[in-house]
Amino acid sequence: MSRPPLILTSTMNATKGAEFSDDSTSLSHWYTRALAKARGAPVLMPNLADKKLIQSMVERCDGVMLTGGDDLHPDLYDPQLPKKIKATAGGIDADRDLSEFLLIEQALQQHKPLLAICRGPQVLNVALGGGLITDIPLERPGSLDHRRKAQAHRLTQTIAIESGSLMHKIFRTRSMKINSGHHQAVGDLAPMLRATARTSDGIVEAIELNKAEAKNSPFHLGMQFHPERLWERYPEFLKPFRAFIKACRP
């Protein structure tokens, strides 16, 4: 039996660890359980912002997953952002921001499959030259309520999926219901990326590489919603993890 693909997984720095009350590497078990269920083996990456270390870790792993968490530093995508909007960005972690930028760089250079969730597609877009909507309620008044963390395990919104996209191939539908738990979203798209799913108010819910870029890296998918919190109740949401692991098989 072949070994399970090793998936280098981004993490967040929790302020209180289980052993001592200091910074600790942290990751929700929903991510690791979804990867394991899809027959992948998660490898947690510390946020050390060390380019040589990250390069080596990507070389040894078969795929990369960017996970959710707090907000990117606004200066990374809009240094001129008004103070009122900038103040809505919370939980800034410069080490994580830089570590994930380096991780994305190496995943692309080494042509490794990449799956990005929640914060993940936002980081991917900014790292490749795109922008963010820093706070949907302030910058897109009248939009749907996207911050429904209390309903993270339920289907609350509907997305339209672009025909022929990787999202379409995975879920085999042009429309589906998802969960939602975010106040930020992908803004201006990076030149290498395209939006392949949106809610009815135009908010981007999935991004992929442009067709020309995808020839070198066929599996790069970012989902703003949280499939890892849905698959136990709605089995179809395990599909992106299975497709990702299949793309990662050595």
Per-range role (PLM):
Residues 1-115, 126-133, 137-170, 175, ...:
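N-terminal beta1-alpha1 cap of cysteine-dependent amidohydrolase-like domains
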Residues 218:
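Short, positively charged patches
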Residues 179:
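Extended polybasic, low-complexity segments that bind anionic RNA or targeting/receptor surfaces
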Residues 221-224:
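Active-site-proximal beta-strand elements of phosphoester/diester hydrolases
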Residues 116, 121:
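Glycine-rich beta-to-alpha active-site loop
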